[in-house]
Amino acid sequence: MAASCVLLHTGQKMPLIGLGTWKSEPGQVKAAVKYALSVGYRHIDCAAIYGNEPEIGEALKEDVGPGKAVPREELFVTSKLWNTKHHPEDVEPALRKTLADLQLEYLDLYLMHWPYAFERGDNPFPKNADGTICYDSTHYKETWKALEALVAKGLVQALGLSNFNSRQIDDILSVASVRPAVLQVECHPYLAQNELIAHCQARGLEVTAYSPLGSSDRAWRDPDEPVLLEEPVVLALAEKYGRSPAQILLRWQVQRKVICIPKSITPSRILQNIKVFDFTFSPEEMKQLNALNKNWRYIVPMLTVDGKRVPRDAGHPLYPFNDPY
């Protein structure tokens, strides 16, 4: 069953459910991608920093293309430019590395992963002596211009942003000749992102939700944090509709026309996550789920400095999460 799609301003159809691959280990991700394709997924979300693009590429080579299970034009593949590759000279080589790893001739969507740049080079997390990150002064507007050249060369069909706030999106729009088509951010009922979604939709951007299930498998999880999949409203709806809590969270998003990229390597869950197009919540039920919002952000990159866990980039002038949205 092919997932329903949203139409990007480029004319591309982007499936509302994709397979997320963050934290999918090499050794497991190839089988997950092959299984997802076999049950109807047509959207795979990747990133250079996830360290598993070569293995995803093996799956794509086996199953995608002329005479194979999935025609290339039916598949939507996203990847992301890492923070160490923001310098305009580094953008095309970074993309070409991703294309080589994924064994593709073009990407459907290429995102700037974060608004700020790290020091150039091959160390993905360059550090100062005190353990803090070494940043680079390249501004995202310069990076954007280099990304636009990739579209002109036919290497990328659409561009987008990840982890940008509303002000930064408008900043990009002020210089863009190729307008961003998608914003990818953390989003789930605890972090509903209503203002940011409205901001994007008013400007012709679609929104992709990462960690749509609340990302309880993160290494730095706080034992006291709320668990979205155990929320009583979610459990009650799961019982009513005979669905899993995960399916309830995903249905809420697709009913708002928000794209979701739940990560799984478990076949039963991969299958479950795409089966969210055959039931519909009432307006009242949508309201109940909307009411869970507490602006709770699970994904804040952390560092240990002097034995304490601190937000890694919060002091950077381009850090996106200091603004209201």
Swiss-Prot record:
Changing residue 55 to D: Reduced activity towards daunorubicin. NADP(+) binds at residues 11-22, 45, 162-163, 211, 213, 215-216, 263-266, 269, 272-273. The modification N-acetylalanine is found at residue 2. It holds the Pfam family Aldo_ket_red. Changing residue 299 to A: No change in enzymatic activity. The modification Phosphoserine is found at residues 4, 38, 211. Changing residue 113 to Q: Strong decrease in enzymatic activity. One of its GO terms (molecular function) is S-nitrosoglutathione reductase (NADH) activity. Changing residue 52 to S: Reduced activity towards daunorubicin. It catalyses: a primary alcohol + NADP(+) = an aldehyde + NADPH + H(+); allyl alcohol + NADP(+) = acrolein + NADPH + H(+); glycerol + NADP(+) = D-glyceraldehyde + NADPH + H(+); glycerol + NADP(+) = L-glyceraldehyde + NADPH + H(+). The modification N6-succinyllysine is found at residues 127, 145. Keywords: Acetylation, Cell membrane, Cytoplasm, Lipid metabolism, Membrane, NADP, Oxidoreductase, Phosphoprotein. Monomer. Catalyzes the NADPH-dependent reduction of a wide variety of carbonyl-containing compounds to their corresponding alcohols. Displays enzymatic activity towards endogenous metabolites such as aromatic and aliphatic aldehydes, ketones, monosaccharides and bile acids, with a preference for negatively charged substrates, such as glucuronate and succinic semialdehyde. Functions as a detoxifiying enzyme by reducing a range of toxic aldehydes. Reduces methylglyoxal and 3-deoxyglucosone, which are present at elevated levels under hyperglycemic conditions and are cytotoxic. This is Aldo-keto reductase family 1 member A1. It comes from Homo sapiens.
